């Protein structure tokens, strides 16, 4: 399929689903999934489309005349699921006419106004536009084009020429033959299917426009189109079966035609039963004579075979039609673009016109405003003249009034002088009267004030006496409390000093003990190091002894060889003795190397062996060294026993620290109690200060009082002196209390510092004890290493003793063999394997002899 053929195969329209022919059904099955969704949306569309299709059907019935377009109820029965589809099938014959005109290359685009100038319903074009707009609402890739067309048709009342659709002639042929040919038989059939897809992809609005445009054709033209359709259906009978191979093999063409004739004769009845409104049989479904006239033509078309040149010509015609359709589509697109440009220009012109109208309105308004302003100007000028006249009149009146005012001023001044004189006399009389009244009031008020002050002084004296007694009691109680607290604090301080001295003595004792223990441990470590060095010297001496024993063994071997040569012993006894000596020497050498390079951590099985071999060690010359090592071991154990009191001392120090912390907590609680008492004393001192301030205020008030008697003045003078003496006493007491409070605060701070120092010293002692414990643990590890070395040395000594015994036995072997052929060596379990081996070898030798 070429690119030009696939341009419009994007959104299948509903036009293809209207036909019921077999070929159309097969072509529709390939895109059934897409069509189902679209048909559902169509079912949910407006119900107005059904009424619109019925109106168009009525107009079509009036236009077509005598031609029977098919039975509407029957088409409704074929597709009851979709009412809109059944209603739109009434226009299928008109679509057939358009297809026939497309094959004849008679494509014409007519204006709806000219086509329906004689129609009975003038509202049909607007209905067509509405139907096109409804079709544009469906999900279609050509939605934008349909919307543009609808807008152009509404603005300009004209229709854009739509491309004339072609119907593949294979549809008609498939209907007559009653079978669907495969799409892969010939390339022409593929092109026909592509045409069907192109027709499907067109929007429904184009179909409606073409239907409306072609409604005005004459019935004679339609009859000619039907005849041409029948002829082309006859020609098309052989086109789906012709391929590139069949063109070369002409013999196969006749066979294919004969087979098709048989299929037509067999299935003709079924194909006639399945009629669609899009097929020619559907067009003539209602009339019987037309069907009868078609059947002989069909038989003639099946019998005769047309040449291939006509097929080629038809293909060329179809290609030309496709090209013309493409050109028309391009022209339509250009027209769409031009229409859009024109619409934009019209909108611009409309905006310009509206702007001009607005400007004209503004100019008219300005003219009216200018006229109003001119009228206002003339009115203002007239008003100004009137105002000038009124001003002149007012000036004249003001001159007359000024004269009258000057005269009245003179009269007023004379009257004012008289009034002033009268006022002066009245003021003097009033002042005399006020002075007399004030003197009377002063004398009365002074008497009342003197009485009030005397009563107040008596009350204040009584109140001061009460406060004096309360202050004396409070001061005495505060002094007693402070003395008691001072004694308690001194006792606590002495107890703390005693405890501190005791702790210092204990710490000194602990230090001395620890120093002595450390010195003892150092001496023990030195002794252990000395013992280790002595053990090393002993191991060196043992190695020397081993070397000497090796030399002795070599000498013994040489002596044994000489004796064997002299005694002429058999060869197998000599070989046995050599093998025994070699096997005895090799494990001794390996044990020596392992003993010298062994680690410090060994199993304790060697210790058990040492305990079993103690009676043997007494006989050896190294027994004295072993006894000394055991004594060192006992000393180390005693050191470990002495290390246990250190842990007890640590526990005692922890307990003492806990006791100190508890005492510190008690001291803090006591400190809080003292702070509360100090707050109470401060509150009392504040009350005393308030009383003193009130007394000072009374003194100031007494100084202001005047006009007293001599006795009252003396008592008033003596009262502040007495109060001052009392206040001095109170001040002295307060100062003493402040001094005591500061001393107590200093003592508390010093004790807190002392406690913090004690805590720091305790921390230092703990750290020192921890370091000592670490040292003790390190010494214990050193002792363990020394013990392990001792065990290693014991094991080495045991191995050396066993080796010496084994060597002695080996030396005795040749002497005993001469006396006893089978010696028993119960004391050496390792040599049993050698004896069994020697006995077996001896038996073999005896058998061979």
Curated annotation (Swiss-Prot):
Basic and acidic residues biased stretches: 135-146
Region (Disordered): 125-160, 241-268
Tissues/organs with expression: Expressed in spermatids and spermatozoa. Localized to the acrosomal matrix and acrosomal granule. Predominantly expressed during postmeiotic stages of spermatogenesis.
Gene designation: Cage1
Record-linked InterPro entries: CAGE1_homolog, CAGE1_N
Biased composition (Polar residues): 245-259
Annotated source species: Mus musculus
Signal peptide: none
Coiled-coil residues: 309-568
Entry annotated with the keyword Lipid biosynthesis: no
UniProt keyword annotations, A-Z: Coiled coil, Phosphoprotein
Name the UniProt record assigns to this protein: Cancer-associated gene 1 protein homolog
